[in-house]
């Protein structure tokens, strides 16, 4: 490995998110293989704290892994992502966050590479520019949606204890399958109606973890999976299905009414039971 690092490229852009959202995203190691599934296949955390985090990260499309440390500089809006082991070992990506307004932050990313000559630095730098443009596009979309959830622009689930309204008609039961997935907006919140081998189910379109878009989540084995962090929830109960203490409110039921209509019934107690 060379004694010194070489600057491969510099990536600069504006992000439509606050400095607070940027730092939240930087510390959010869990999202890497989910939001960035085209780049990363998995992550195993070793340690994390206010300083940053250290983890083993699988690369998509193969068996290669990186041991990565992300570390903040004290009292500065700067962090380093260093490759401790694996492809690019010794390299240091330095990111500077520059707030421009309440909801706009500029970033400057410097790729300092452990390569023997300038030609290789330039070659790898070009690839990193393409990769990071995609990664920041994906992160920006996540941060914008996260801010909308916090601001209440997107409807959030009704609070526990809210009185149950009358059943909501969804249309003819015989035609429901053909209309799925079906988005339903109610005073109790926004839901998606889906079908599995066990029947019809409705679930909130917002993940209780960080407001992720469950309305875009995959339905697997009776669970809905959050596309941001991979949290899994049981469709029938709203309970977390992956051992993490994170649960949805008890979901409404989809049932056949006496008149042949599909009806959405809301429970009086909206908290999922153990």
Predicted regions span which residues?
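Intrinsic-disorder/low-complexity, polar/charged segments enriched in Ser/Thr/Lys/Arg/Asp/Glu/Gln
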Residues: 6-14, 52, 92, 104-106, ...
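Short cysteine clusters
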Residues: 207, 226-229
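Short, hydrophobic/aromatic-rich segments at coil-to-beta transitions
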Residues: 49-55, 74-81, 177-183
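Hydrophobic-ligand binding "helix-grip"
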Residues: 34, 39-42, 58-102, 271
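Hydrophobic ligand-binding cavity/cleft-lining segments
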Residues: 1-49
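Beta-strand/loop substructures that line and gate deep hydrophobic ligand-binding cavities in soluble
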Residues: 82-131, 262-264
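Short helix-coil boundary/hinge micro-motifs
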Residues: 5, 14, 59-63, 72-76, ...
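N-terminal pre-ligand scaffold of iron-sulfur
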Residues: 20-24, 33-40, 133-221, 234-235, ...
